[in-house]
Amino acid sequence: MAQSTLYSRVLGTGSYLPPDRVTNQQLTDRLAKEGIETSDEWIVARTGIHARHFAAPDVTTSDLALEASRRAIEAAGIDPQSIDLIIVATSTPDFVFPSTACLLQNKLGIKNGGAAFDVQAVCSGFAYAMATADSFIRSGQHRTALVIGAETFSRILDFKDRTTCVLFGDGAGAVILSASEEPGVLGSALHADGSYSHILCTPGNVNRGVIEGSAFLYMDGQAVFKLAVNVLEKVAIEALAKANLAPEQIDWLIPHQANIRIMTSTCRKLGLPQERMVVTVDQHGNTSAASIPLAFDTAVRDGRIQRGQHVLIEGVGGGFTWGASVFRY
C-alpha cells in the first residue's frame, strides 16, 4: 500500500504587540528634545509608517513570544504538550544563550523534551523558520511545531539616527504547524549572500564582558532598497514554481512589512492587485522577523484570509538573506 504524502498545515495563528503605541508625532517630539529633526510627513512619505509599538524596559523578546504563542495555541485548539518542535526567529534574543526558544518552551510549561532552537535571519527569519519547521514535519521527525517571529528591535536602535530609529518596532507573531495529509505548505525557497553583510547589520559583539563595536543597527537604506526589490520578485516566483502555482492563483501576499514602497513594488512585479496585499507596516512599523506572522494573524482574525486560500509570504533581511513560502491556509 502506497504511503500518503505528508504535509505541514497551519492550525492556528497568534500575535502580540506591547501596549506602548508610539505615533510618528510622539516619536518626532522625543527626537526633537535631542536636537534630531524629522516629521510625521517625512516618515509617512518615505516608509508608509504612522505608528509602532515599543516594549517596556522589563519586557523581553521571550515575553512577547509567549503572548503570541498562547494565542496561536488557543486558536489551534491543541494541548501545548503536543508541541514537539519550537523555532523562534529573532535577532534580538533575551540572552547570547540559551536560545529564546528554550526559554519560551519553559514559560509555556512544555516538558516533553521536544526540540527548541532559534533561527537568525533577521527580517526574513520567519520565512526561514517556517520552511525549516515544514521540512522537519515532512520528514516525519516532528508532528506539531510552534513557529514564532519575535523582536525587541527598540533595544538596538540609535535614537540619534533618524534614518533608522523611525522605522522599527517591537512585537511577536506565531503559527502552529502540524502534520497533515491535506496540503498546507506547498513550496519554499531560501537564499543568502554574505557579501552584503555590511549594508544592514548590528556590528557590535561581546568580548570579555565588553561590547566591542557599535551595539546599534546600521543600514545603508539605498543599497537595501535596490537589492530587496530585485531579489523579492525572484524568490517569490521560485516558491510559486515549487508550489506549481501562478501568481494570479495567490489570494493573499504577505510581504515583510519593511517599507510600503518595497512592498508595493513587489506586488506590482508579481502582477497582483494591491487589494490582495496585507499591509500592517502603517501601524506596526518594521518588526523584523515578527512582521510576517503579525500581518498573517491580523488578516486571519479580521476575516480577510479564509481557509482554503493560497498565501504567499516573502521577506528580505540582513545577511543578506531572503526567502518565500507558499501555503494553503
From Swiss-Prot:
Any idea which UniProt keywords this protein has?
Acyltransferase, Cytoplasm, Fatty acid biosynthesis, Fatty acid metabolism, Lipid biosynthesis, Lipid metabolism, Multifunctional enzyme, Transferase
Give the reactions, separated by semicolons, that this protein catalyses.
malonyl-[ACP] + acetyl-CoA + H(+) = 3-oxobutanoyl-[ACP] + CO2 + CoA
The ranges of region (ACP-binding) come to 257-261
Cell location: Cytoplasm
Q: Which GO terms describe its biological process?
A: fatty acid biosynthetic process; secondary metabolite biosynthetic process
Disulphide linkage map: none
- Keyword Transferase listed? The answer is yes
The keyword Transmembrane helix is assigned to this record? no
Q: What are the GO cellular component annotations?
A: cytoplasm
Instruction: Specify the domain of life of the species encoding this protein.
Output: Bacteria
One of its Pfam families is: ACP_syn_III
Family under the similarity heading: Belongs to the thiolase-like superfamily. FabH family.
- Comment block on domains: The last Arg residue of the ACP-binding site is essential for the weak association between ACP/AcpP and FabH.
Assembly information from the UniProt record = Homodimer.
Specify the protein name. Answer: Beta-ketoacyl-[acyl-carrier-protein] synthase III
Which organism does this record belong to? Burkholderia lata (strain ATCC 17760 / DSM 23089 / LMG 22485 / NCIMB 9086 / R18194 / 383)
